[in-house]
Amino acid sequence: MRDRISDFLEEKHGLSANSKQSYKYDLEQCLDIVGERISDTSLKIYQAQLANLKISAQKRKISGCNQFLYFLYHKGEMDSFDRLESAKQAEKKAEKPEILDLDSFWQGSDFPEGRLLALLILEMGLLPSEILALKVADINLDFQVLRIQKASQQRIVTIPTSLLSELEPLMGQTYLFERTGKAYSRQWAFRQLEAFVKEKGFPALSAQALREQFILRQIENKVDLYEIAKKSGLKTVLTLEKYR
């Protein structure tokens, strides 16, 4: 797929060198996340990654990616023309967030990994990438804390008592979520989470929306915004101001 970017750009006449470079950067970034096997699931993952960008940036990246996807479809390299949702459509879907009744998440499930992923996001505000990178060695159930490491930075997060029994059976592994000692991919996590929330009747509930539920619950409990930012790994409280 990546080697087809140059062919795609050659067919776009009248573009300046800077515009072509911008297209190339956006498409390479898209393929870094989507991978070589483009699917509806991988496109949803990429769409979620764009959600925090300005609408203008989203429109540019979505337009470029959709043009490239159509190019691949037109050349017979894709069976169907799968595309990203327009930024306007995504914006229209945005409504004022409210606290959802997610008590059913604590009940049994045919998707136990998806269930635990959802609970870790909902109860602790962790990102899926942080959860997948989490090693058992970074979890201390006795002190009810876990350590999140990102590059040279780390933060200590308190584990709610309600999650201790969920984590205890996994303490003999290397990673919290693993297969033969290797951490699972983001696409695996996305599929597990998607299957679980569908099972519970919340098909539109993404990892980002679950993290938002964590924030809303913290605010409901009168937790200071700076403390919420610290728990969530946010550098500032600016993104939390809208929830006041």
From Swiss-Prot:
A GO BP entry: DNA transposition
Segments forming domain Tyr recombinase: 90-244
Keyword Ligase recorded: no
A Pfam short name: Phage_integrase
GO molecular function: DNA binding; tyrosine-based site-specific recombinase activity
InterPro entries: CB, DNA_brk_join_enz, Integrase-like_cat_sf, Integrase_catalytic, Integrase_recombinase_N, Tyrosine_recombinase_XerD-like
SUPFAM superfamilies: DNA breaking-rejoining enzymes (SSF56349)
CDD domains xref list: INT_StrepXerD_C_like
Residues at the active site: K150, R211, Y243 (o-(3'-phospho-dna)-tyrosine intermediate)
Main subcellular location of this protein, as a coarse class: cytoplasm
Gene Ontology cellular-component terms listed: cytoplasm
Protein's cellular compartments: Cytoplasm
Family according to the record: Belongs to the 'phage' integrase family. XerD-like subfamily.
Role of this protein: Putative tyrosine recombinase. Not involved in the cutting and rejoining of the recombining DNA molecules on dif(SL) site.
Protein name per the record: Tyrosine recombinase XerD-like
